[in-house]
Amino acid sequence: MTYFVLFLGLCFVLGGLAVASNPSPYYGVVGLVLASVAGCGWFLSLGASFVSLVLFMVYLGGMLVVFVYSVSLAADPFPEAWGDWQVIGYGMGFAMVLVVGVVIGGFVESWNFGVVTVDSVGMFSVRLDFSGVAMFYSWGAGMFLVAGWGLLLTLFVVLELVRGLSRGAIRAV
């Protein structure tokens, strides 16, 4: 199980690296899917099944819509590939930043802050993950309505921007 969690962490970091150094929006979608699946699997291995499911639905349901619009607006006739020297340079630069972060993180880890889990303690306790469901729908109902209206307004704004003056989709020239 430890190796699987380490593998998910490595996939999450590589997915974030792929999103940050993508040569075109087509490859950014692949990196986002890899990072979201690995991150949600990581949460699932920690026992946060509801949070993992909600984040998976948000990332793959909402963020991929943003990438679809960005791909349609920035469609290149000759997109760059992963093997181009500029993309490899970006990847190496981000990898160096990650290595420096791991070195600094090893220094900070020596301070020993402890490990935080999502399970409650006791025989008749409700898991903190599932008690969050009740808080989402009781205290956060107004915020859900405001966020829903904001997303609907954003959808209409993006549709108007894509439509343009010619009453059709924007095409690459």
UniProtKB/Swiss-Prot annotation:
The protein's enzyme class: translocase
Localization per record: Mitochondrion membrane
UniProt topology in membrane: Multi-pass membrane protein
Pfam families cross-referenced by the UniProt entry: Oxidored_q3
Secretion signal, residue range per the UniProt entry: none
Enzyme Commission number, as recorded: 7.1.1.2
UniProt GO molecular function: NADH dehydrogenase (ubiquinone) activity
One Gene Ontology CC term in the entry: mitochondrial membrane
Keyword presence, Transport: yes
Reaction catalysed by this enzyme: a ubiquinone + NADH + 5 H(+)(in) = a ubiquinol + NAD(+) + 4 H(+)(out)
Coiled coil: none
TM annotation in the entry: 1-21, 27-47, 48-68, 87-107, 139-159
Location, primary (coarse class): mitochondrion
InterPro entries with a match to the protein in the record: ComplexI_Subunit6 (IPR050269), NADH_UbQ/plastoQ_OxRdtase_su6 (IPR001457), Nuo/plastoQ_OxRdtase_6_NuoJ (IPR042106)
The entry's keywords: Electron transport, Membrane, Mitochondrion, NAD, Respiratory chain, Translocase, Transmembrane, Transmembrane helix, Transport, Ubiquinone
Purpose of the protein: Core subunit of the mitochondrial membrane respiratory chain NADH dehydrogenase (Complex I) that is believed to belong to the minimal assembly required for catalysis. Complex I functions in the transfer of electrons from NADH to the respiratory chain. The immediate electron acceptor for the enzyme is believed to be ubiquinone.
Family membership noted in the UniProt record: Belongs to the complex I subunit 6 family.
Protein name per UniProt: NADH-ubiquinone oxidoreductase chain 6
Organism: Brachyramphus brevirostris (Kittlitz's murrelet)
Lineage of producing organism: Eukaryota, Metazoa, Chordata, Craniata, Vertebrata
